[in-house]
Amino acid sequence: MPRRRAALPALALGLTLASSLALADDAELGRDVYEEFCVTCHGKDMVNSGGVTFDLRKFPKDDFARFQASVLNGKGQGMPPWRGKVSDDDLKLLWAYLQSGG
């Protein structure tokens, strides 16, 4: 029993580190997706280049549903719908990049 108790914190730490590395990898891959689909309007560092596009650094970090709807359906007159152009995996990678702060 004492060995199990000692092993649990080590296991938890290992899982946390593995999860953090996976998120970092996703953010890196998300940057590639961002550069392919988003950088023209939203700018290199998620800040527009003087246009009317939304500053993505200010996007709520806890609202994936809103992010997904905005990307897939478009937003207003400036943001085109990307449904059918970005995959579900690309969308998740973009979200990881957004979460990382660029």
Question: Which residues does each predicted region cover?
Answer:
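Bacterial N-terminal signal peptides that target proteins for export
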Residues: 1-11
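Short alpha-helical segments used as structural interaction elements across diverse proteins
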Residues: 1-2, 28, 72, 80
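Boundary at the C-terminal end of the N-terminal hydrophobic targeting segment
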Residues: 22-24
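Gly/Gly-Pro-rich "capping" loops immediately C-terminal to redox-active cysteine motifs
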Residues: 27, 31, 35, 43-72
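Short, cysteine/histidine-rich loop/knuckle motifs that typically chelate Zn2+
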Residues: 40
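Extracytoplasmic electron-transfer domains, predominantly the class I c-type cytochrome c fold
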Residues: 55-102
